[in-house]
Amino acid sequence: MTIVAFQGEHGAYSEEACRKHFGDDVMTLPCRTFEEIFSAVESGQADFGAVPVENSTAGSINKSYDLLLDHDLKVHGEILLRVRHNLLVVPGKTGEIRQVRSHPQALAQCESYLNRRKLAAVPWYDTAGSAKDLAANPVEGVAVIASKLAAEVYGLEVVEEGIEDMPNNYTRFFVVGKGEPPRSTRSKTSLVFAVPNTPGSLYHALGEFATRQVNLTKLESRPRRNRPWQYVFYVDLDGHWQEEHISAAIVGLLNRAAFVKLLGSYPAAPPLEQESIAGQSALLQI
């Protein structure tokens, strides 16, 4: 059975992402930190890890990108998870809600909902953790914001679904593992590089992709740790590194860059439009 490590308690959105990618029968391994995910995969305790790398509203998750640079694991896949926040209570305690607990980011993403109802927001260490703690120690007038999976895991009641302020709230995850993933018909490639601190160096580096018609879907700079005011550049592009024009672009980049690290070529997640259509079809069948 496949074992996948994730950060958080059982019922976390990261565990939901694991189930979406690997199926409901996957065995999941909760980890306290992102570092523990990488350690679990490297030690063989888990086959893969699911690491959040980007949120459609909050942007990139820098810690994850730093760990991808520091470790030798490869990206084996990506997951695009629609994050739907739900208001959960202990069954039988659906009276007046005065206080809502959750992770600070979840509270921020539901700020308008909470303000309209004049609910006091109380930060908690984890969305699923807030559900776990409330189930263990029920408190009158207290609810939590978490996933429907957390409600199932801890036996809580969903009072209201989809309370997030922005409905198109997605988190992108990388599936990390050892070795190279099998090649797929629709691939993406992620890499990181640095260029010499000279005029035009970044322009010429990116030109290796442009002249070969390689489509870059993401370009982001990050500070190089222990090297003030020096930067590395993270790139996502369409295609597999073994495709002739992409491998030629990477060879050209190697000749211009101070260093290049290939994070992996992996199956791309289904486009959001397809997921939206599938979701609408499912609603019509209800």
PLM feature spans:
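Domain-level signature for soluble enzymes in the chorismate/prephenate branch of the shikimate pathway
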Residues: 1-286
